[in-house]
Each structure stands twice: as structure tokens, then as C-alpha cells.
From Swiss-Prot:
Optimum pH is 5. GO terms for cellular component: cytoplasm. The gene is UGT84A23. It comes from Punica granatum (Pomegranate). Its EC number is 2.4.1.136, 2.4.1.120, 2.4.1.170, 2.4.1.177. This is Gallate 1-beta-glucosyltransferase 84A23. GO terms for molecular function: 4-hydroxybenzoate 4-O-beta-D-glucosyltransferase activity; cinnamate beta-D-glucosyltransferase activity; flavone 7-O-beta-glucosyltransferase activity; gallate 1-beta-glucosyltransferase activity; isoflavone 7-O-glucosyltransferase activity; quercetin 3-O-glucosyltransferase activity; quercetin 7-O-glucosyltransferase activity; sinapate 1-glucosyltransferase activity.
């Protein structure tokens, strides 16, 4: 391992959401394990949560042959500002401040002997590639959904095929290299009636800048989405590097990106027989209505299965009410049920006691399930989840479908919940799903070991970053300082207070 200052330095900028931070931090750890110095940054409002919940510090942490370090920046708003929950307000604010502060951070790193050679961002903040271009640095982007969803958004953005519209709400969508998607299997942010148009705008914003990154990294693997990846690689410079949550060069690294401390539930799982526990978690952003929560609770009770259920409290500014369990639920469940606020999901899915995963089908959870050989009960709600559910159930054949998503506007009854749990844990279909899940686990493991498809792609990316770093060093002694215009913008947009807090200038 080289010294920190001698390593090629990449700078990762993350949108401050749990589903964005985790995969980008996982990529950072993989890059560090390949011998790079990685700096990870996101707004300080999230940095505080990460310091509290995860094992991160201000000192560079060794990972494999390299290091990872953290720097956070103020987004110009007070810590308790509720407008962060409104992306239409927060994304412009983040861009305004980020375009000022990120160049300053990069310049400071150069002055301290850590010149940056590449910037990498995830979706919702495509302006990072503008910053890189201004500084004369190459940039890359990590796509945090499936390649199938990337291709769907690409075709929608460029108007290449018909999608559901106000005049044709229920048309099916045929995309190249993909199975026919029913209208409610298309990423739901593309529906004309989506209640989340701001998320459609946020995702499609990346496609406006898609020609600037020299590489689009994807948290998937060649064997999983082979035909789609082959097609997409002809129109965009993609490299599959997943599953990112596995890091063979640093399997025991304790650096995590969680915003909440996980509750201790592994000891409870240890006390249960093999393949006897249903794991229920709907991720970090999905919140169901109370009546649906009640039906799931009674379905779990009536099924007779052991269960571990994650009930994450909503953000205080989200507008959601805290969900409650039916009266007497925990007493009736007894020791066969455990309810927690957050879990160490990777460990839970890898535990021999876990039989199946009731999931919202977000891509992070989908990849973790497939890589762990875990069958799923698909409970998608919106966004890419409905497309992921289509693939998990119909294409990868590792799941039972419990619902079709929020657009269905249908209460899933306790009887349906019970039936799906039994189907996923008992009988011939459960055995077939487990067999298929183990097949995908083997394929995933083969992709990230040394010489596997994802490992080769990641190494090729690292080699390209190093090559470009040599070119940058040869062309100038240090990273280009922020242009005068950017510095002037800094003076007009933000003020740094005596306590280090950055605020919008009056």
C-alpha cells in the first residue's frame, strides 16, 4: 500500500439520500481496494448522521491497497430546514452551493498534496460533471438502478418509443433487448399521472449531461442483464461493476454509509432454525398507509412464520405519520417475531435462518437479495421498484408478486399476504425460487472475484483514471484553480461564518 499522498485521487460527490449514498460509498471502497485514494463528500446534514450511525472519522481509512476519507460541505440551509424534503427546492440549492464549494474543496486538496484526478457523482446531481469540466478534470457517473431502467429512461428522454401518456394511459412499452413492459411495469415516475413529477425531473436531469462523463458505472453485472447491457453499451460508455456491496479485497471493512444505527437482531436470528424467518423491509423511503400496515401485520401472524420486520420511522419533515402495530400484535407474535427500526440488511440476507425477503424491490435491495441467494416477495410501490419487481418475478424467477405498485391503488389483504408468504417458504415453487436465487448468487460471485466480468471492468476503469491522471500531471503542475468567475460566484452565493457554517449571502 502506498502512502496516501502518492495515490491517484478520485473525488466522489453523492446526492444526500440513503439509496444514493450506500452504492456510491460501496464504489468508493472498491476503488480504494484497487489502490486509489478516495474522498467521499455529501452535505454535512447527512455527514452528521453518518458519523453517528456508521464507523467513519476524519482520518483516512485503509481499504485494501488504498484509502477512503470523508469531507462534508454545508448546503447553505439550517440543520432543521424542512425544504430539504422538497426536491424542486433542494436540488437547485444544492447545485448553487455545490458548484461553488466543490471546486474550493478540490483546490484545497491540491494545495495539501492530494490533487484530484477524477470526479464521480450519482443521479440527481449531474452538475458535478460541469464542475469537473470547468476544472479540466475527467468525470464519471454511478447509475444506482438497473441497466433496464437506465435504458427505459434513455428512450423516454429521447422520445424513441411510445410511453403511457394522457391520451394512452395503458399502453405497453416495447424497448430494445427487453421483455414487453405492461404500463404498470414501466418506471412509474414516467407515468403522466405520477404524484412525483419532481423525481422524474431529477432523474432525467442526468440525461442532459450524459455526454460529459467518460464512463457510466452501473451497480449490476454482465450475467444478470446480458442482452440489455450489450445493447446499452453501443449507445453509452457503460461499465458494469456490481454487485458493489461485495468487496473481496476488503471483506471486513467497517466503513458504512447508514444514516441510522442498525438494531441488534443477529443474535435473535441465531436462535432460529435454518430457512425459517421471513425478513420484511421496505427500504429507507417507502412508507405505507396504516391500513396496509395492519394487513401485513395480520398476514404475518396468520401465516405462522417467524419474521423480522423493519419499521423505519419517517423523517420528521416528511409529512408521514408514525405507523403503529395492531393492539396486542407483539404479544401474539411472541418469540417468533422481532420488530426493529433498522437492520444490518447484508448480514440478515446472508444468515442461514432467513428464508425469504418481503421487499419494496429497490435496486440496492434487489441486488443484495440476488447476490445473497435470497428469494423475494415483491411489494413494489413506485419508481424503478415496479420494473425491478417485473424482473425479479418474471425474468430472474426468484420471487412471488404480492402487488403491482402504488398505481394499482389497492389494499393488499391479510389473506393475500399470508398466501404469498406460504408460497415463498413452502412447497415446490419455494424450492424452485431458491434454486434460481442460488444460481444468481453464484453468477454474482463469479462476476466480482478477481478476473470476473465486474472486476475486469472496475480494473479497466481504475487503469483509465490513472492514465488520465498522468496526462493531467503532464499538462499542468497542479489541478487548475477555480476560475475567477467561480470564485466571484462564491463570494456572492455563500458566506463562511466564524463557526465554519456556510450560508447564502444576503
Amino acid at each position: 500500500m502506498g502512502s496516501e499522498s502518492s495515490l491517484v485521487h478520485v473525488f466522489l460527490v453523492s446526492f444526500p439520500g440513503q439509496g444514493h449514498v450506500n452504492p456510491l460509498l460501496r464504489l468508493g471502497k472498491r476503488l480504494a481496494s484497487k489502490g486509489l485514494l478516495v474522498t467521499f463528500t455529501t452535505p454535512e446534514s447527512i455527514g452528521k448522521q453518518m458519523r453517528k450511525a456508521s464507523n467513519i472519522s476524519d482520518q483516512p481509512a485503509p481499504v485494501g491497497d488504498g484509502f477512503i476519507r470523508f469531507e462534508f460541505f454545508e448546503d447553505g440551509w439550517d440543520e432543521d430546514e424542512p425544504r430539504r424534503q422538497d426536491l424542486d427546492q433542494y436540488l437547485p440549492q444544492l447545485e448553487k452551493v455545490g458548484k461553488v464549494l466543490i471546486p474550493q474543496m478540490i483546490q484545497k486538496n491540491a494545495e495539501q498534496g492530494r490533487p484530484v484526478s477524477c470526479l464521480i457523482n450519482n443521479p440527481f446531481i449531474p452538475w458535478v460533471s460541469d464542475v469537473a469540466e470547468t476544472l479540466g478534470l475527467p468525470s464519471a457517473m454511478l447509475w444506482v438502478q438497473s441497466c433496464a431502467c437506465f435504458l427505459a429512461y434513455y428512450h423516454y428522454y429521447h422520445g424513441l418509443v411510445p410511453f403511457p401518456s394522457e391520451n394512452a394511459m395503458e399502453i405497453d412499452v416495447q424497448l430494445p433487448s427487453m421483455p414487453l413492459l405492461k404500463h404498470d411495469e414501466v418506471p412509474s415516475f414516467l407515468y403522466p399521472t405520477t404524484p412525483y413529477p419532481f423525481l422524474r425531473r431529477a432523474i432525467l436531469g442526468q440525461y442532459k449531461n450524459l455526454e460529459k462523463p467518460f464512463c457510466i458505472l452501473m451497480d449490476t453485472f454482465q450475467e444478470l442483464e446480458h442482452e440489455i447491457i450489450e445493447y446499452t453499451s453501443k449507445i453509452c460508455p457503460i461499465k458494469t461493476v456490481g454487485p458493489l456491496f461485495k468487496n473481496p479485497k476488503a471483506p471486513n471493512t467497517t466503513v458504512k454509509g447508514d444514516f441510522m444505527k442498525a438494531d441488534d437482531c443477529i443474535g435473535w436470528l441465531d436462535s432460529k432454525p435454518a430457512s425459517s424467518v421471513v425478513y420484511v423491509s421496505f427500504g429507507s423511503v417507502v412508507y405505507l398507509k396504516q391500513d396496509q400496515w395492519d394487513e401485513i401485520a395480520y398476514g404475518l401472524l396468520n401465516s405462522g412464520v417467524n419474521f423480522l420486520w423493519v419499521m423505519k420511522p419517517p423523517h420528521k419533515d416528511s409529512g408521514y405519520t408514525v405507523l403503529t402495530l395492531p393492539e396486542g400484535f407483539l404479544e401474539k407474535a411472541g418469540d417468533r417475531g422481532k420488530v426493529v427500526q433498522w437492520s444490518p440488511q447484508e448480514q440478515v440476507l446472508a444468515h442461514p435462518a432467513t428464508a425469504c425477503f418481503v421487499t419494496h424491490c429497490g435496486w440496492n435491495s434487489s441486488m443484495e437479495a440476488l447476490t445473497s441467494g435470497m428469494p423475494v416477495v415483491a411489494f413494489p410501490q413506485w419508481g424503478d421498484q415496479v420494473t425491478d419487481a417485473k424482473y425479479l418475478v418474471d425474468e430472474f424467477k426468484v420471487g412471488v408478486r404480492m402487488c403491482r405498485g402504488e398505481a394499482e391503488d389497492k389494499l393488499i389483504t391479510r389473506d393475500v399476504v399470508e398466501q404469498c408468504l406460504r408460497e415463498a417458504t413452502q412447497g415446490p415453487k419455494a424450492a424452485e425460487m431458491k434454486k434460481n436465487a442460488l444460481k444468481w448468487k453464484a453468477a454474482a460471485e463469479a462476476s466480482f472475484v478477481e478476473g470476473g466480468s465486474s472486476d475486469r471492468n472496475l480494473q479497466a476503469f481504475v487503469d483509465e483514471v490513472k492514465r488520465r491522471s498522468i496526462e493531467i500531471t503532464a499538462s499542468k503542475p497542479a489541478v487548475k484553480a477555480a476560475p475567477n468567475g467561480v470564485v466571484a460566484a462564491a463570494e456572492s452565493v455563500v458566506e463562511t461564518k466564524a463557526n465554519g457554517k456556510v450560508e447564502l449571502a444576503a
